[in-house]
Amino acid sequence: MSITKEFDTIAAISTPLGEGAIGIVRISGTDALKIASKIYRGLRGKDLSAIQSHTLNYGHIVDPDKNEILDEVMLGVMLAPKTFTREDVIEINTHGGIAVTNEILQLILATMDHNAEPGEFTKRAFLNGRVDLTQAEAVMDLIRAKTIKQWIYVSLKQLDGSLKTLINNTRQEILNTLAQVEVNIDYPEYDDVEEMTTTLMREKTQEFQALMENLLRTARRGKILREGLSTAKIGRPNVGKSQLLNNLLREEKAIVTDIEGTTRDVIEEYVNIKGVPLKLVDTAGIRDTDDIVEKIGVERSKKALEEADLVLLVLNSSEPLTLQDRSLLELSKESNRIVLLNKTDLPQKIEVNELPENVIPISVLENENIDKIEERINDIFFDNAGMVEHDATYLSNARHISLIEKAVDSLKAVNEGLELGMPVDLLQVDMTRTWEILGEITGDAAPDELITQLFSQFCLGK
């Protein structure tokens, strides 16, 4: 899209609400400079329309009705089209705090008909062709990134256009294939046309399918980098699960007592393990109980175990294995599991020869071998074949994954039709459907309702 669309001018606070060193109030639209000029007084009284683009300018924000200075500011001027929204943009950098930023915003809104909705700045960047839908979604992922690996390898690469380029190139290749097949069909007087058309369709379909399936194979690692490695800690009550959580978090979050059943719900926290977000789920101890509240916690623990990418089973190594320990070993045997033998600071009584592989002796009381847990997790999920590749494009967005799966299904339908000897012109329908599905990923073929729903998830001011 080369021509910027005409929208109302909008404004919003772009920094988090609350106390802070600075606050930013952003204005975007054709009237941005005119609106800012009504409340901004530069040091030399220079008109904003005469100020060079992409500069910071010292001055004051003044209430024009009272002629009172509200704040000392640095005002950024960025003129279209070289801005995020491809519109004229003013950014007022104020002292932090909700009072002053909100007061300045109210002065601005008094001269406007339209306040910014959540995500509207990014939506305008999309509608004006500055970013595609994958890049717009990457902006939201950057805001929510929990670790630097997610930031660099998933969100930043997507914002830079890695997925957009791959999808657009594939769509163009599909279009070229459809055009070539169409030409061959339109000139049937040549004896070898049908064979050439079928051969071309088969080769290209297999090529596109392999590319999409390779992309799908990145989804598991991409999901882990984006959402975190869901990790459930299980064990009978009072074996040290809550203290283990505190040790990994390096702060007190869970209640640690000698009373069984202290953790009555599922506690979720994130911890950075070598750049990978680990979503630690601290479950209630799984045991038979008559306590209604604790029973609900136990059921939630079992559900967390079923949904976990990784299970940390904590056993008390200072006692022999109990029936409940053996039950938990059986319950988690199909999971990616690490067995932690806690209380190595006490005399050992557990039957080590009855335990499975992947066992780490620890002492949560003395914080012993906690680092080995982190190393083992990294070995299981990210060493060798699982290592994060710097140049790879990762699928991490559920919407993208679902659409790629649909595209693969359409390509499979083409291949199956070719095997059955169906006419190529009938199979063009499925190939065209693949082209349309991929367009939904970038936004070239996305319905308006989807676009509205996606941008509504953004924070106000972005």
UniProtKB/Swiss-Prot annotation:
Enzyme nomenclature, EC number: 3.6.-.-
Hydrolase as UniProt keyword: yes
Positions that bind GTP: 238-243, 257-263, 282-285
EC main group: hydrolase
The protein's required cofactors: K(+)
Highest taxon listed in the record's lineage: Bacteria
CC annotations in GO: cytosol
Residues reported in the UniProt entry to bind (6S)-5-formyl-5,6,7,8-tetrahydrofolate: 26, 91, 130, 462
Keyword check for Ribosomal protein: no
NCBIfam families: mnmE_trmE_thdF, small_GTP
Protein name per the record: tRNA modification GTPase MnmE
Organism: Streptococcus agalactiae
Gene name for this UniProt entry: mnmE
